[in-house]
Amino acid sequence: MRSGELEEKGTDIWKLFREAQQNILYLNKQRIMAKEELDRVKREKISLLDRIEQLERTKLINTRKDKFSISAELLLRIDAMVLTSLIGSKEASEFRRLIMDSNVSIADYFSEIMHKQDTELLVELRHFSGKSRKSGYHVIHVCTEMAPVVSVGSLALYVTGLSRALQRKGHLVEVILPKYASLNLNEVHGLREVDAEFHSYFNGQLHGNRIWTGVVYGIGVTFIEPLYYSSFFSRENIYGYSNDFERFSYFSRASLDYIVKAGKQPDVLHIHNWETSIVGPLFWDVFVNQGLEGTRIMLTCQSLESQCVEQPEKLALCGLDPHGLHRSDRLQDNHKSHLVNVLKAGVVYSNKVIIMSSMQTKGQIINATIHGLEPTLTIHKDKLVVAPPGFDSSAWDPSVDKFLPQNYSADNMKGKSACKVSLQQHLGLQEQASIILFVFMGSGQTPGLNTAMEYFEEELKDENTRFLNKYDEALAHLVLAGSDIMLCPSFDDTVLQVPLKAMRYGAMPILLNSTDRKSGHFVDRDLEGSKFSGYVKDNFTNIPLSQAIDELKNNPSKWDKKIVDAMTKDFSWDAECCDIHISAYAAIKNL
């Protein structure tokens, strides 16, 4: 072959080589773009499912066919009739009892006439009478949070979850909240301003308030908006201001003034944390003889760490007697005797005190050394009740979860494998990985996180691991469904409720580090321990991560039995948590 031909052939080969390289680069680029597009489509699918669920929830609310929503709205209309002097307190009380009657289908009768004016609606109410009252309790929450309207911590989930569970069991529940500027009003159905002001005492004078009413998840909600002290709740944050005592004592006093003005006679006034604890002494010293003789007070503490200590003279702002209350057996702080303790007021003046904790017993809470209320809790120990939080089983159920590529249940676990594959693909994990582990921390700072991570890295070195430090609602469902093991900072998780949801979705909850794992030993099996704490102690508390992994790999029958058993347990709001509260309501009504 001639040199020219060789040179030409070499040029052709080099050209073909460059073209092949370009084709390979192009194909790689197309593959990357295709993968990115696939990931984008998957993210959009999850987002779309979330949006569909929101639209369906909104549609359900807007149809106004839910019996709880209609009953709640009807109660709020009755309140408005009292405030505008259309009816008296006695007749309003009779109407409320009528709504609580289990033998009457309020929703069916009134669903088509709720649009009528108050005068027309009153005529229908007066015709709709003569029935007997059912045995349920009428509970009014005076609180500072309620999901999803205003949510900062565990209180919001608790108020909504417990209220819905109580209504499903035949009790009548209402909520009173401040009208914050930051309210999520899109979640409030039928929001309306009541065309009447009511006045409340504060700082030596009567001040006007505007009332707004609406329905959230079938629960009647009243929002109190101060007119003169309008800056109290027009701020960016809910808590954390130097005048928080003034803000929430005003709201507490206004709530009681409103209850009396509207002619309400609830069985239980349910107050929460220190922010509404001042309701206790206000009720017994000022309001009990204003038509509320049959009402009792329940306090729930999400935590004993936040208490609010103030100068005694500030009690006079809402109409209390500082001299009479600044005593060791009343509001005087146990450590700073020159101050009063607002949370202590709630403990002393409530008929029952619910302390929310998944794992601790009453004795352990009383003997704790961090909150300073030990003497007070010891004196009032017969009032104390410990209740574990629940979770929303309708939103967190793998058998109907719309976020999952395939549903599954304890009776049929096939769908969990499909969820695992989907999660592996979403996070770029190897599809042949048999175990997926997650640390689901949420968006805030978690105490002890660095120590926990160090422990985890020492115990498990695996590239098929992902740490999710930011909470994503849609991804959370897929994480639970696709995981075999969920690493939890604590079993006392009242915000994200990871241990509860993990068991529901067939993932084993394991404590993150050895220090937390040892804490399981303090869950003594006395009569005060909850069913949840006993179950967790027996099945999960003392299992290290290495043992869980070994059991999953080498003893699948034992693993499957334990997982399926956990999935069948009911730790929702409707179960143990609700039952404990109903028992507490019954106990204080018999006092």
Predicted regions and their residues:
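Catalytic cores of nucleotide-sugar-dependent glycosyltransferases that transfer UDP/GDP/TDP-activated
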Residues: 1-591
